[in-house]
Regions:
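A short Gly-Trp-Pro
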Residues: 1-118
């Protein structure tokens, strides 16, 4: 199965990252596992009306990955927490929640522009 690399402009990602967007690797759940430690979770109702479960480090509080209950077969991994230069992902595939992009940013060239979630 494929992996999608997406920049998310939703308000929740902006707030959680204290930034204009978050960088995510959306991967099949069956190919994902936490290899060290134990995560803590909290959830909220997303724009889709479904719960979104946020998994974060219990020691430092960094967001690690999300579980959109609307899409139960995938996890949305925050690229900055990946080992082996996870933030150097090469080209990205899409921007999501483009309707919430902050005014001072332009669309990233060559990326699919998606209103709402994938």
């Amino acid at each position: 199965e494929s992996v999608t690399k997406a920049i998310c402009h939703c308000l929740d990602c902006q707030k959680r990252t204290a930034s204009a967007f978050s960088v995510n690797v959306i991967a099949p759940r069956e190919h994902f596992k936490v290899t060290q430690g134990k995560t803590k979770t909290w959830s909220y109702t997303s724009d889709s009306g479904k719960d979104y479960i946020v998994n974060f480090c219990g020691d430092c509080g960094s967001t690690l990955f999300g579980e959109p209950t609307r899409l139960p077969d995938v996890v949305s991994i925050k690229a900055g927490c990946l080992d082996n230069s996870g933030t150097n992902l090469g080209s990205m595939d899409a921007e999501v929640f483009v309707e919430r992009r902050v005014d001072y940013l332009k669309p990233f060239e060559g990326m699919k522009q998606i209103v709402g979630m994938i």
